[in-house]
């Protein structure tokens, strides 16, 4: 693959920003920076691009050398976690202004004596006239003059963002559109409507999703504009939570929550399929957390997810996150050793980074010899020119050892076991607890800390194969380059599966809308996928099945319904252990995804056919004792070569 310009694929994570660059000759290059390093640069992504183009500040970036930039970012996620979004006003029907705060009355901790109710993301709410019935028909008209005055009062109070959520708007968006038009005339900077944000049944989930969109979109837009200003006239794309790219101009807050991790799943799936593995567990261990995912032939997506204590109803890749990463803080609590959930982040980072940070999982690996300072570049400290601080780590572990009356190495190894247990439990939640047998799966390990813990996690889970791609340390960024642009259109339905054929026109309209939005981004539609979300009547458990035959085919109805019924029962039995053959199967919703052409995985050439030899020997603490571990360079290992441990395999 060759191009006359550079392409940049970037994953801006909580601790590190990874950049994969495709140069004009078709060669790939990798670079990793701290996401926050204010002494060195204002923005890590732009700093990485400057690094490859050899353009230091304050020179303008030579954008004529750039073909495209594809990014995943945690900006929206961090704003949600830290509750630093835009002040939002919530607009709804009369009698419903407290509905989102009341919610479903769920208690996250049912035995808690002191119940802490989550605070809503919006700061104020107003009720307006107008009403639709359950079929979307108007039963009370909007009083536009009165609504105009109410919105004007909000604007005068300083609100710039509003979330408009009206009853049954997913069936008829006209009322929300009229209110949004008034808000636009008044001058609100951010106007989110539920009929556009999440046109699905369930008022509470739809409303909360719309509020999240209004809360995060201004923050996200500021960051996008900041990047775009540094890269004028460059094709700038961002990864969405459902695993597809979109143009920067239409990137919304609701689609940005899993922007970074989604690139990792795409990268894991594409590289695993290229290597011949069809059933995988994605294991993405970064500095702050670990994301695990399940893949058995198709991307798993959830349309109702809770993120940072907020319920959202938009398509997201099925990712389970656990607060265990390289930066997870190791500490004691009432005499017990704990790992996480707090993280040292990028600043100050682990103790070994020489920025005054606490002991972390990374420091455990440094102390035990699994991370050797001499094999790392001198990029640490305030001036980014020092090696990892082994002596500082030893000093802090000695203090902890005095507290627990244990050897420092025993404490460090114990902390790693706790972290591995937490990560293995996360994998079990998305696999064995859903009826999948992991013995035939491959653990695809990636992320900056994945390679250090993949073997221990695989042993814990009974997985016999691990795939460590040569780009595993930057696989989320690499996944941005392999991803397709895609648009998903979802519509709620409450009909029996046996009546599927009657929805042909509605599904065709969804297809046309998805394809139109994709072509509006100057892309050619290469693939259209239709997915059904089914449930037993009276159940709230939804399973997804792909539609493999067109609905407008005269032969479709009977054969397709029979096939879908059998597949639904099979999947339900696998996951829950029983079926209900006499209960009607209902269509909850249907989604249509229009995608552009996929991108091929780059072949990584084998450097040698000779068996790689050990280049060094280093002390490593494993299984309760210090041992001598051989050191190998990954690029010098030959196919099918076996190694006897303990050993370190280095990937530059």
Regions found by a protein language model. Name each.
Residues 87-137, 194-198, 479:
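Active-site phosphate-binding/coordination module
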Residues 216-234, 493-509:
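Extended, charge-rich low-complexity interaction segments
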Residues 145-157, 264, 277, 287, ...:
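C-terminal, non-catalytic interaction/recognition modules in large multi-subunit enzymes and RNPs
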Residues 24-30, 106-109, 119-138, 159, ...:
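Gly-rich Lys/Arg/Thr-decorated short loops/hinges at beta-loop-alpha junctions or inter-strand turns
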Residues 165-210, 214, 375-378, 547-549, ...:
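Terminal amphipathic helices with adjacent charged low-complexity linkers/tails
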Residues 22, 31-38, 89-95, 113-118, ...:
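Glycine-rich phosphate-binding loop of actin/hexokinase-like ATP-binding domains
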Residues 1-87, 133, 140-163, 173-197, ...:
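N-terminal glycine/serine-rich phosphate-binding loop of ATP-dependent small-molecule kinases
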Residues 10-12, 16-41, 111, 117-135, ...:
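Short glycine-rich, Thr/Ser-proximal phosphate-binding strand/loop in the N-terminal lobe
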């Amino acid at each position: 693959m060759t191009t006359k310009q550079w392409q940049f694929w970037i994953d801006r994570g909580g601790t590190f920003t990874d950049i994969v660059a495709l140069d004009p000759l078709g060669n790939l290059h990798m670079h990793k920076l701290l996401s926050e390093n204010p002494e060195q640069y204002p923005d890590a992504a732009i700093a990485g691009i400057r690094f490859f183009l050899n353009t230091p500040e304050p020179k303008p970036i030579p954008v004529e050398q750039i073909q495209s930039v594809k990014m995943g970012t945690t900006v929206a996620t961090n704003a949600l976690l830290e509750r630093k979004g835009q002040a939002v006003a919530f607009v709804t029907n009369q009698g419903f202004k407290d509905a989102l705060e009341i919610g479903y009355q769920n208690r996250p901790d049912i035995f808690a004596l002191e119940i802490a109710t989550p605070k809503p993301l919006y700061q104020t709410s107003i009720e307006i006239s107008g009403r639709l019935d359950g079929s979307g028909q108007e039963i009370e008209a909007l009083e536009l003059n009165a609504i105009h005055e109410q919105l004007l009062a909000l604007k005068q109070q300083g609100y710039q963002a509003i979330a408009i959520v009206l009853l049954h708007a997913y069936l008829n968006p006209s009322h929300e559109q009229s209110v949004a038009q008034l808000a636009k005339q008044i001058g609100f900077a951010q106007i989110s409507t539920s009929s556009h944000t999440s046109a699905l049944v369930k008022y509470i989930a739809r409303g909360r999703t719309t509020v999240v969109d209004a809360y995060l979109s201004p923050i996200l837009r500021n960051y996008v504009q900041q990047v775009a200003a540094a890269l004028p006239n460059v094709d700038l794309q961002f990864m969405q939570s459902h695993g597809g790219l979109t143009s920067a101009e239409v990137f919304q807050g609701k689609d940005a929550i899993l922007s970074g991790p989604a690139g990792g799943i795409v990268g894991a799936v594409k590289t695993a399929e290229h290597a011949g593995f069809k059933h995988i567990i994605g294991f993405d261990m970064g500095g702050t957390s670990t994301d695990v995912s399940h893949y058995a032939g198709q991307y798993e997506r959830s349309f109702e997810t809770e993120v940072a204590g907020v319920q959202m109803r938009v398509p997201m890749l099925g990712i389970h996150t656990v607060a265990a990463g390289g930066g997870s803080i190791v500490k004691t609590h009432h005499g017990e050793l704990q790992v996480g959930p707090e993280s040292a982040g990028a600043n100050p980072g682990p103790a070994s980074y020489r920025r005054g940070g606490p002991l972390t999982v990374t420091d455990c690996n440094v102390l035990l010899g699994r991370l050797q300072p001499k094999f790392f570049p001198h990029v640490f400290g305030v001036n980014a020119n020092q090696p990892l601080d082994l002596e500082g780590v030893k000093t802090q572990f000695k203090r902890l050892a005095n507290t627990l009356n244990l050897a420092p190495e025993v404490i460090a190894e114990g902390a790693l076991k706790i972290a591995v247990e937490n990560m293995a439990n996360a994998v079990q939640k998305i696999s064995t607890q859903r009826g999948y047998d992991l013995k035939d799966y491959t653990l695809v390990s990636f992320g900056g800390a994945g390679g250090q813990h993949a073997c221990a996690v695989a042993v814990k889970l009974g997985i016999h194969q691990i795939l460590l791609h040569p780009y595993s340390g930057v696989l989320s960024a690499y996944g941005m380059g392999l991803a397709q642009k895609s648009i998903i259109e979802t519509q709620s339905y409450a009909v029996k599966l046996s009546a599927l054929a009657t929805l042909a026109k509605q599904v065709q309209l969804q297809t046309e809308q998805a394809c139109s939005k994709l072509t509006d981004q100057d892309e050619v539609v290469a693939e259209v996928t239709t997915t059904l979300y089914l449930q037993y009547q009276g159940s709230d458990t939804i399973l997804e099945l792909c539609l493999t035959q067109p609905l407008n085919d005269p032969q479709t109805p009977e054969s397709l319904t029979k096939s879908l019924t059998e597949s639904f029962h099979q999947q339900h039995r696998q996951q829950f252990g029983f079926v209900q053959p006499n209960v009607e199967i209902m269509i909850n919703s249907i989604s249509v995804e229009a995608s552009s052409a996929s991108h091929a995985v780059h072949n990584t050439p084998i450097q040698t056919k000779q068996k790689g030899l050990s280049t060094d020997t280093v002390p490593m603490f494993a299984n309760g004792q210090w041992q001598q571990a051989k050191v190998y360079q990954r690029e010098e290992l030959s196919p099918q070569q076996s190694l006897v441990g303990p050993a370190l395999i280095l990937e530059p």
